UniProtKB/Swiss-Prot annotation:
This is GMP reductase. Catalyzes the irreversible NADPH-dependent deamination of GMP to IMP. It functions in the conversion of nucleobase, nucleoside and nucleotide derivatives of G to A nucleotides, and in maintaining the intracellular balance of A and G nucleotides. It is an enzyme of class 1 (oxidoreductase). It comes from Bacillus thuringiensis subsp. konkukian (strain 97-27). Transmembrane segments: none annotated. The lineage of its organism: Bacteria, Bacillati, Bacillota, Bacilli, Bacillales.
Length: 327
């Protein structure tokens, strides 16, 4: 694996602009049978998404994935979303009761449009078996499987029946897998994405390590169809986390999915908790992301997201911020 780099090591090179205004650029993306306004999905984490935000996103044509940390609420959630004519997109784990849950959905003729199998180390027989189980009982559901960090894993999960794979092991801001285990794609997530995308025949969701809106464009350049983002979506008015005031400033909590705060216990901890500055409304962030991505498309010399996939780039080894703190 030569040529290892991460988001801050790369600059995309502009191509001749063909639009008069960035508003002519189209940021929509298709995943499965549905088209979404942005190639971005808030992380399926407890401090990022809840039922209210899921509903808001679905109503406004953004992709979402509900977290799996209140498993007993999932059936009513699917019913509720579908009764409003919205997509139902849920997460499952790989434990025994999740197999029963999938069978229960089939028995009740409930088919979520999207099911994400979401475990920290997704290149495993446990995930392969779950993909096959879902495909057997709910063949119409679009299955996203992860998380993985190698081309072998992408190929195996696709061959097992996954409709998309989620790439990223530990690059997230509240993820400490890299520190606790020594493993993962932290520090080279963008190169890992590129490596995996070359092997993929189905969509890839880049998950983790996004620190700026420009990183979304870079992810698209290196093969992502969709980009999952945690920290940039944390700390909004609507976010589920707790709000605290410190030195006259407002902050919201944000913690990792395998953290003791989420589990309620100190066992197999691979996540930490932090407080992020209160960011105002989620809608404003989504609009800003869309506008920034429209600008990216115009710099790429096109009118659609795909134009970003063919631009040239340079590797600048950690120098693009010149020591400036951006956010």
């Amino acid at each position: 694996m030569e040529n290892v780099f991460d988001y801050e090591d790369i600059q995309l090179i502009p191509a001749k602009c063909i639009v008069n205004s960035r508003s002519e650029c189209d940021t929509t993306v298709t995943l499965g049978k549905h088209k979404f306004k942005l190639p971005v999905v808030p992380a399926n984490m407890q401090t990022i998404i809840d039922e209210r935000i899921a509903t808001y996103l679905a109503e406004n044509n953004y992709f979402y994935i509900m977290h799996r940390f209140q498993p007993e609420k999932r059936i009513s959630f699917i019913r509720d979303m579908q009764s409003r004519g919205l997509i139902a997109s849920i997460s499952v784990g790989v434990k025994e009761d999740e197999y029963e849950f999938v069978q229960q959905l089939a028995a009740e003729h409930l088919t979520p449009e999207y099911i994400t199998i979401d475990i920290a180390h997704g290149h495993s027989n446990a995930v392969i078996n779950m993909i096959q189980h879902i495909k057997k009982h709910l063949p119409e559901s679009f299955v996203i499987a992860g998380n993985v960090g190698t081309p072998e894993a992408v190929r195996e999960l696709e061959n097992a029946g996954a409709d998309a794979t989620k790439v990223g092991i530990g690059p997230g801001k509240v993820c400490i897998t890299k520190i606790k285990t020594g493993f993962g794609t932290g520090g080279w997530q963008l190169a890992a994405l590129r490596w995996c995308a070359k092997a993929a025949s189905k969509p890839i969701i880049a998950d983790g390590g996004i620190r700026t809106h420009g990183d979304v464009a870079k992810s698209i350049r290196f093969g992502a169809t969709m980009v999952m983002i945690g920290s940039l979506f944390a700390g909004h008015e609507e976010s589920p986390g707790e709000t605290i005031e410190k030195d006259g400033k407002l902050y919201k909590e944000y913690f990792g999915s395998a953290s003791e705060f989420q589990k309620g216990e100190k066992k197999n901890v691979e996540g930490k908790k932090m407080f992020v500055e209160h960011k105002g409304s989620l809608e404003d962030t989504l609009i800003e992301m869309e506008q920034d991505l429209q600008s990216s498309i115009s710099y790429a010399g096109g009118t659609k997201l795909d134009s970003i996939r063919t631009v040239d780039y340079v590797v600048v080894k950690n120098s693009i911020f010149n020591g400036d703190k951006v956010y």
